[in-house]
Amino acid sequence: MSKGTPSRGKRQTQTHLTCRRCGRMSYHKRHKICSSCGFGRSTRMRSYGWITKRPKVATH
């Protein structure tokens, strides 16, 4: 497969669809898992501590 402009024409298929649980375009069509909320993998909502910003704390 070549690089550059010719390979850009192969990008026509949809990878992600709208998730039924969170409504974002993050549900993977082939893997059947939402990358945003974890639908299809877990009954709990996907949430990690490293996603949210922590409040600024005085260091001195």
Swiss-Prot record:
C4-type zinc finger span: 19-37
Record keywords: Metal-binding, Ribonucleoprotein, Ribosomal protein, RNA-binding, rRNA-binding, Zinc, Zinc-finger
Gene3D superfamilies the UniProt entry points to: 2.20.25.30
Binding site for Zn(2+): 19, 22, 34, 37
InterPro entries, per database record: Ribosomal_eL37, Ribosomal_eL37/eL43, Ribosomal_eL37_CS, Ribosomal_zn-bd
UniProt xrefs under PROSITE patterns: RIBOSOMAL_L37E
Gene Ontology annotations for the cellular component aspect, listed alphabetically: cytosolic large ribosomal subunit
Listed cofactors: Zn(2+)
Cofactor binding mode and count: Binds 1 zinc ion per subunit.
SUPFAM superfamilies per record: Zn-binding ribosomal proteins
GO MF annotations in UniProt: rRNA binding; structural constituent of ribosome; zinc ion binding
Biological process annotations from GO: translation
TM spans (from-to): none
Family as reported in the entry's similarity comment: Belongs to the eukaryotic ribosomal protein eL37 family.
Function text: Binds to the 23S rRNA.
Protein name: Large ribosomal subunit protein eL37
Species, as recorded: Methanospirillum hungatei JF-1 (strain ATCC 27890 / DSM 864 / NBRC 100397 / JF-1)
Classification of source organism: Archaea, Methanobacteriati, Methanobacteriota, Stenosarchaea group, Methanomicrobia
Gene designation per UniProt: rpl37e
